[in-house]
Amino acid sequence: RRSSDLLIRKILGLANSSHSIILDFFAGSGTTLHATMQLNVEDGGHRQCILVTNNENNICEEVTYERNKRVIQGYTNSKGEEVTGLTKNNLRYYRTGFVGRNRSMQNMRKLVNLATDMLCIKEDLYTEQNTFGGQKTYKGIFRYFDNGKKQMLVIYREEAIDELVDIIYDLDITQPIKVYVFSPSEDPWEGSFDDVSDKVELCALPQAIYNTYRRILPKKKDAVVMPEDDALATTQKDKDLFDGMLNFTDEEEA
């Protein structure tokens, strides 16, 4: 194992940037991530590593993840020696999932939740806040992420834009907030954000997410999914919200 670690570290060291993002589609035991973290220690770099693998014979959960968790936290090796952890690193674990093809509230909500995780990875921003400018965030309407260095606002309901723009207008910010809007159209919404154009950076949804969202978004002419068909659309409140009757005070808090 040591020889493979050294080889991968040498290969990674050939890259010019100490802020590279390394993608390994054949993660195996996680040697690439281990080597990345070790190389960062050696040269003060800030490389990031994404591992992708299946979980055949539980290798991802029991080997790949466990190995790198221990590398970060510290561990005792086979000789009984204490190995100091590479504690300036962190590790996140995601599982893929399937979203049904049928147009329904359930599939739409599942997609936006999963897609938001992907946006967090894209922006390298994971710290979710439960308020935005004094307004509580609400599940299914908008979510807000802020790690003290950058901010991201993800809007699921177009009807919320005007109120959120009013909130942004009154904010004193040092850099633009990245804004994503889930919408059946590719409208970037510049017009709606004109008054706060200096405070936001409107971001297009990745094309794959946008295409999937359009495919499963219930059409307005479709009958509202009934509770027995959709476990997440169980109340009149849900159906009212879906039909455009936005009400911040009634929607379930995130």
Each predicted region: which residue ranges?
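Accessory, often C-terminal, charged low-complexity segments
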Residues: 1, 5-21, 41-254
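A phosphate-binding catalytic loop at a beta-strand-loop-alpha-helix junction
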Residues: 20-39
